[in-house]
Amino acid sequence: MKVLYDHQTFTGSQYGGISRYFYELMNAFAGRQDIEFELSLKFSNSEYLRDVNYSHPVRYQHFANNLRANQLFSRINRLYSSTKLCLGNFDIFHPTYYHSYFLDKVGKKPMVLTFHDVVSEKSGSMFRVLGEGLSELKQQLL
């Protein structure tokens, strides 16, 4: 079985709970013979990926605080993930966050979607900027 993970949670941040979850999941899979996986990622500053042997993204820490650079690297990563989806060389797709860019690309392949928390739903008024539109995205993906 081959699992394809996308770029979303590893683009734009060095650390995070969701990226840590996927890092641990991929590390567990790395030691198994019956599971192959690929992380479709070209650019990342994630510290979790610094020393792993299954992903070697280009680091861009000198541009980490530059909004335009982050947008560019995010678009490149999304294009790369989209290309991998269209090629179809996987059995299961597991997106790492809630952006819906992949819905028209995954085809009939099975997909695993993990909802990590409901902070934005429960405390949306406190986190308007961070959670804006997140509930709607989650509903669209269901």
Question: Can you say where each PLM-predicted feature lies in the sequence?
Answer:
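Carbohydrate transferase catalytic cores enriched for Leloir-type hexosyltransferases
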Residues: 1-142
